[in-house]
Amino acid sequence: KFDGRAYEGLIEGKAALGWAGGAVLAGNLELKHMNSTRLLAALGSDLLTEGELSARLKLDAKADRLDSLVEALRVGGGFEIKRGAARGFDLIEAARSSGRAVARGGETKFEQLTGVIQYGQQESRLGDLRLTSGLLTAGGNLGIARDGKLSGAMNVELKSSAAVVRMPLAIGGTAKAPQ
């Protein structure tokens, strides 16, 4: 069992390491109020987000040798980022352009972004994504390959006093340059 402070937030967890036909790791991890920009940078992620991250995660790994556990690590669970921004793409501008052109650059500010992460060595998946920001709501999923390539889709809804615009958007490009 462990707890501490990291990236302007708190981390708590419990893990067990065993040897049953190889090295086995199982545990739970809770992150509270962490700086998502600093945490993702420390993990080597190219995703450009900012905001206050909280998550409840399960960890597991099984390998023939102890020194191979990190390569076999799988992480999954729910997360929430509050008062943040996703940099590199602007969902509002992409929805307004109605898919006529590939949207690049900008940022999407949000009050809340929630979802489920499944991390593996070959690919990570962000599912059940739900983003809210005033009159903007979006939901979808995103895959991030080991080489940083993105694949996914978002359904974006923009409300105004006169109309509601709904737009399905495909996500591609890379984590450094989404489109």
Predicted regions and their residues:
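Small-residue helix/turn framework positions
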Residues: K1-P178
